[in-house]
């Protein structure tokens, strides 16, 4: 059978069985998989994978082993009942291997009052499925599994190996993917179906969390002039951070960031301080996220922020005597930069063009993924492409469009066949003749 005929057969199967993908996504959304609660959602993934006759590896990442790796950054103390899953379909040989990586963990739902429907009810309405994780990224995971199911149902034989990974902890720094790398899983390329709105992200921003402590001097609120308000001093710190963000982003000239207003944000996420309404606050803690451009090293970015805040002492004597304290904690996502001429791009472009009859948009991501770990720790080049829009991720009323999810599954199926290569019955016959 010609490659075009095989591709047509796979696409027709996906069209005819779209209800399977919808049911799977609803089941995945229905299993809440926030930090430490991933077990039941992974059980759904495992049940599906067992239908594909793949070699399956299930394990709980080891904190002891992970702590030995320099890229391990996580707040977790253990991964009890938070298993990783890797399923491998061994190819016939002679093709390129591929990792299909998706994270099963989701961020908390926040206030249920802000939701149109229950966050884990998975309601379908007007071509959209609502629920926490629908876009980030159970819709993408469903697209991967649906593509694999089509290849299995159509008895497609590949030359290269395919490794499907359903990992934990991406939202907290990527310990699940790092554990898979340390377990030996690598490939010639990888695709992560994060919500890119069907764009190809060939460069990914990294990020890391910081904590800044600002000191003050406590006093009675009635005589506040005898104290020094850490809250007021923290306003100077925040202004300095905002100025640094402008300086850092002014350096970005990569055209792939042209449509992103702030390519590498420095976001302030939490502020806490003060102990009593009638007291002058003697301490404020600011926590946030600092973006890392694809070409930057995390250590250099850390040093720049620390030195920038150290300069406050030249403008305020208080900071000279009480310098702000900066620490880096919790999660970190490494940046990633795929060369413009890498075959991952051209092969995915070709698959996209076959389905959409138009050129895909190529951009850089405004957020980090596990792609940085796959590349820097696993020596595996990565491209990010998937259904869903970032604007709904991490928000109330998160949703994904069913049509985009099905369409992305088709593109991914075509991509897998082209990247790994098709092994035909004729090649089996030729191999047998040569053997005899």
From Swiss-Prot:
Natural source organism: Bacillus subtilis (strain 168)
Cofactor note: Binds 2 Zn(2+) or Co(2+) ions per subunit.
Binding site for Zn(2+) 2: 136, 171, 394
Keyword Cytoplasm included in the entry's annotation: no
One Pfam family, short name: Peptidase_M20
GO molecular function, one term: metal ion binding
Enzyme Commission number: 3.-.-.-
Protein name: Uncharacterized metallohydrolase YodQ
UniProt-annotated catalytic positions: 105, 170 (proton acceptor)
Obligatory cofactor(s): Zn(2+); Co(2+)
Stretch forming the signal peptide: none
Binding-site positions, Zn(2+) 1: 103, 136, 194
UniProt-listed PANTHER family: ACETYLORNITHINE DEACETYLASE, PEPTIDASE M20 DIMERISATION DOMAIN-CONTAINING PROTEIN
ATP-binding is among the record's keywords: no
Family per record: Belongs to the peptidase M20A family.
Keywords: Cobalt, Hydrolase, Metal-binding, Zinc
